[in-house]
Amino acid sequence: RFSMWGSVGLSISISIGYDNFKKFLIGAEKMDIHFKESPIEKNIPICLALIGIWNSNFLGSHTQGIIPYTEYLNLLPSYLQQSMMESNGKNIDRSGKKINYSTGNIIWGGTGTNTQHAFFQLIHQGDKLIPCDFIGFKKSLHGNKDSHNKLMSNYVGQMQALMKGRSLKEVVSEMVSKNIDEETINKNANFKVFDGNKPTTSILIDQLNPESLGMLISMYEHIVFTKGVIWNIFSFDQWGVELGKVLASKLLTEIE
């Protein structure tokens, strides 16, 4: 979960070059310093951790979507699954007692507009509360402003729809303005209603590069740590994977 900053980072350095890897580390260090020195009300990881705890422990959400609006981060949701779920998926507190409150959430997601045609139906009109992190970038990597502007319009538009929704009155008014007959309005209007008031977090970054990626990953690590402290759990063990491995070892002998 956290090995990329140490010796395992050698493979990253070989892949992207040492100069880029150094920028990656510099970005992570900047977020480390921000987390250590910034006051709580301006501390990004702490504020996001508190928002997550509010959504989970007070609003009853048990899941979180990670939606980066760039295909370059298509593996980020999978990475954060391990980082968040293995770290905080615990039901025993630091004193060894059973916990009677919700801790680690189910983490999942996908990239940009692809996910809009995959699972956004459930987020918009389903009966489950699914807070989402929307990760966007102000500047395109390749200078294609037209494509990037379309991407960003979807980035903002989806969050606006989740926040504001659309009332029955608004739906009917729009259908009337399009000269749709009353029978069709009565038949279809309710299907077009969006409740809104769905929690989202907008994480807007200037441009995707090694430094900003280092800051982003470090930010999520500090969110994990902060939640673990508040929930009074050990975020850096993984007892939950042990039993399956022990049983698998015994079963392998029998299978062979």
PLM regions: where:
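Short alpha-helices
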Residues: 1-26, 195-239
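Helicase-primase coupling helices
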Residues: 102-207
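Charged, low-complexity, helix-prone segments enriched in Lys/Glu/Asp/Gln
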Residues: 31, 51-55, 80, 148-167, ...
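Active-site phosphate/pyrophosphate-binding segments
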Residues: 1-144, 196, 245-247, 252, ...
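Short, flexible segments with low predicted structural confidence
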Residues: 55-56, 184, 215-217
